[in-house]
Amino acid sequence: MANHKSALKRIRQSAKRTVANRIDKARMRTFAKKVLAAVEAGDVELAQQTLRDATSVISRTAQRGVIHTNQASRRIARLNSHVKKLAVAAAS
């Protein structure tokens, strides 16, 4: 256990940030799962709508510094490719 006042404060701050970051990451994963569920169901309209929502949430998570911007871009790109494949298959 820390002995210095500043170290104790850092522990408190770190715990507080950890909780907030965990909530943000969980929210991001939930939105990504909604997109994938819509793709699995074959619903193009719902997939596109949930992709917009997920993109917003993922970008905000990166903006807050919870995840790296490259990771956010990669997640968005992968979700986007799933939705595009579905749209192309539905159009055919």
Curated annotation (Swiss-Prot):
Keywords, sorted A to Z: Ribonucleoprotein, Ribosomal protein, RNA-binding, rRNA-binding
SUPFAM superfamilies in the record: Ribosomal protein S20
Domain of life where this protein originates: Bacteria
The protein's role, per its UniProt record: Binds directly to 16S ribosomal RNA.
HAMAP family in the cross-refs: Ribosomal_bS20 (MF_00500)
NCBIfam families tied to this protein: S20 (TIGR00029)
Protein name (database record): Small ribosomal subunit protein bS20
Species in which this protein is naturally found: Magnetococcus marinus (strain ATCC BAA-1437 / JCM 17883 / MC-1)
Lineage: Bacteria, Pseudomonadati, Pseudomonadota, Alphaproteobacteria, Magnetococcales
Gene: rpsT
